Amino acid sequence: MREKTKKLSSILLCLVFCFSFSTAVYAASYIYYDGGLKSATVDVENRLSNSSVYKNSVSAWNSTNTPVNIKTVPGSGHSYVIDGVYNDTWYGLYTPKNRQWIISGRAGKFTIELNRKELVSESDNFWQSVLVHELGHAFCLDDNP
C-alpha cells in the first residue's frame, strides 16, 4: 500500500510541475501580427488634437526595454496618428500602408485613427492606453482574442 501511495504522489507531483511550467511559458508568449513595420524605428507625424496624449504614448513605448524607437517628425509622407469623428464603435484603428506585397507582408508606414465619437467622454489616460495599444500593432503585436 505504501508503494502505491508513493507512486501516486510522484505522478501527481510530476503533473503539477508540468502544468506549472507550461502555464508560465504560455503566459510569456505574444500573438504575432504580420502587418507590423519592417523596422522598429519609425518616423511618425502627430496630427492629434491633444498632443499630450501622443507625447505620453510615444514616451511610454520609447522607454520600454525593446528596440522600439518612435521619432516625431513634421510633414506628410510619414506614418501618422490622427483623431476624428467616425460613425463606428471602435476606439482606435491601425492601418498598415506600403506593404511588402500587394495585400500582405510587413508595412513600410501606417496610419492610426482614434475615434473621438467613442473617446469623447474618456480620460486622457484612456486615450493614451488606446494609442499605446494601436502602436503595438506597428511593432507586430496582434490583438489578444
Task: Identify what each model region corresponds to.
Residues M1-A27:
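Sec-dependent N-terminal signal peptides of Gram-positive bacterial secreted proteins and lipoproteins
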Residues V25-P145:
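Zinc-dependent metalloendopeptidases
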